[in-house]
């Protein structure tokens, strides 16, 4: 984040950054924000195992479900930490091998940042059968559906980029088309 903020080329505004750079910014924000929850869970489980604490040990009054919440609160955004740079690479490859500029650049950036904004509120869809209160099912179901909107912005940009392009079918382009196809089905 600091590198992009302070060491951009002279005259390069935020609106002219390559989409791959935006995808790395998005992944970096997620890593910076959510990794500390994983570290806290690891510290708590270490204290349970070594020092006799009982954060997660039900026999001693701990809450095993708390570990599951903390685990998924980190692990679901971690999926996006891994996939967002891949989205950026895919969009760059599609633009290059379609011989066109990226379609709807600002919408693609908004999609990447929208995924970042929503990724912290979808973790509990992994926990519908683990004892979570029933009244929480609907909000997490809705958040799971809503996160598809910014993802749709990213893939609309991908499809718009290849539309009417002079497509050059080489190995990177075939791989990028495979990524788009897999995320669209």
What is the meaning of each model-derived region?
Residues 1-185:
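...captures the hydrophobic TM-helix bundle architecture rather than a specific catalytic motif
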């Amino acid at each position: 984040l600091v590198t992009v903020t302070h060491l951009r080329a002279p005259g390069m505004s935020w609106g002219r950054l390559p989409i791959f750079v935006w995808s790395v910014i998005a992944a970096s924000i997620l890593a910076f924000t959510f990794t500390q929850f994983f570290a806290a869970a690891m510290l708590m489980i270490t204290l349970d195992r070594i020092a006799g604490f009982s954060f997660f040990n039900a026999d001693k009054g701990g809450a095993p479900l708390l570990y599951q919440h903390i685990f998924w609160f980190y692990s679901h955004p971690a999926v996006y930490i891994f996939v967002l740079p891949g989205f950026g690479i895919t969009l760059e490859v599609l633009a290059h091998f379609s011989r066109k500029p990226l379609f709807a650049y600002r919408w693609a950036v908004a999609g990447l940042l929208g995924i970042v904004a929503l990724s912290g509120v979808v973790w509990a869809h992994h926990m519908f059968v683990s004892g979570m209160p029933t009244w929480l099912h609907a909000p997490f179901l809705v958040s799971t559906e809503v996160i598809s909107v910014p993802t749709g912005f990213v893939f609309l940009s991908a499809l718009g980029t290849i539309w009417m392009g002079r497509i050059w079918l080489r190995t990177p382009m075939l791989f990028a088309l495979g990524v788009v196809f897999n995320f669209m089905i």
